[in-house]
Amino acid sequence: MDTIAIPALNRPVDATVEIPGSKSITNRALLVAALAQGDSTLENALFSEDSEYFAKCVEQLGIPITLHPHLAQIQVSGKGGDIPAKQADLFVGLAGTAARFITALVALGNGEYRLDGVPRMRERPMGDLVTVLQNSGITINFEGNSGFMPYTIYGQQFAGGHFRLKANQTSQQLSALLMIAPYAQQDTTIEVEGTLVSQSYVKMTCRLMADFGVDVTQTDDNQFHIKAGQRYQARHYTIEPDASNASYFFAAAAVTGGRVRVNHLTKQSCQGDILWLNVLEQMGCQVIEGADYTEVIGPEQLQGIDIDMNDMSDLVQTLGAIAPYASSPVIIRNVEHIRYKETERIRAVVTELRRLGVKVEEFADGMKIEPTPITPAAIETYHDHRMAMAFAVTGLKTPGIVIQDPGCTAKTFPDYFTRFFKMID
């Protein structure tokens, strides 16, 4: 297995970095551009395993896509809600967003579409999304466990109507249904039962739909209403840098008492993970916002924090990786749903912190991390890109940290370590 040794610094980080486009926005923009009528150009698009799996699936459905990786640009020739391909065998790898978005997209088609992914993807929940589609009259045949991949969808144009959806494990199912709803045969109302996790991603979805010309009405009781007959408008669209991926660079400033500036990303971002800046401020960092950049300056000593991370759960690993350096405990709450991500993320973070000698208490929905001197170790990443990226930051403060399988970052940030080492050069 490949490994990367992280060189500990005896000085603060001082760098300005450029972050590739947001994965979440790239995938949403790609879907709505595919449904629009005409040609759209997506600038600063993310090119990674996840986004490329998604783009390939859309192209297999008969919607022309031209990728320009050197320009970070994707051109999409949308078909106005039509799915030209009547049969397709679609592979999504470990891309949960692609799995759920493509599942919804093919419901608009009139054909036979098989979806599958890697073994871990077969363990990730799809149940409520496929149940809504079945309740709308679409036939789905499961090859294994009901509600899980692989399965075949027999599309017949999504009917729309009134549906109830549980979104306590992932909000991607809700986002998928929202984005196809304008092309349903009738108005659609989606009522979310119980707690909606990662609400910030749903807000991102609604904002992007509006950017492409479609209105969503949300009531206070977590009901979403979309009128049928609305259509996305093809357009030129620039994608923000990825706030989740920026978190590791901001964390490097925090943990070394240094300075990191990320260009083209501000607190006005539509990404929920921009809330990471608030977390760092509460831990003692100074956050400076310019017209088109954000800068974090780390303190001499990080402070502990007790925080609900439900709306920024992709950052649990980032916080976990710097928490041992705080002056008091760090408590992370309300993220039970991350047990169903690329790996069982709560258990993975707890296990690797304990490997480093850190005192950690695991909860059903989070953890408590005590300030602890760290023992050097090789970090197991569990094929999870965020484990590799987060614990690389730990290595800036403590000598002897080695990241196993660093190539797993290709899922969302292929040149992460190139940019990481440039930051500390």
Curated annotation (Swiss-Prot):
It comes from the Bacteria. 3-phosphoshikimate binds at residues 23-24, 28, 170-172, 198, 314, 341. The active site is at 314 (proton acceptor). GO terms for molecular function: 3-phosphoshikimate 1-carboxyvinyltransferase activity. Its EC number is 2.5.1.19. This is 3-phosphoshikimate 1-carboxyvinyltransferase. GO terms for biological process: amino acid biosynthetic process; aromatic amino acid family biosynthetic process; chorismate biosynthetic process. Belongs to the EPSP synthase family. CDD domains: EPSP_synthase. Pfam families: EPSP_synthase. It comes from Nostoc sp. (strain PCC 7120 / SAG 25.82 / UTEX 2576). The gene is aroA.
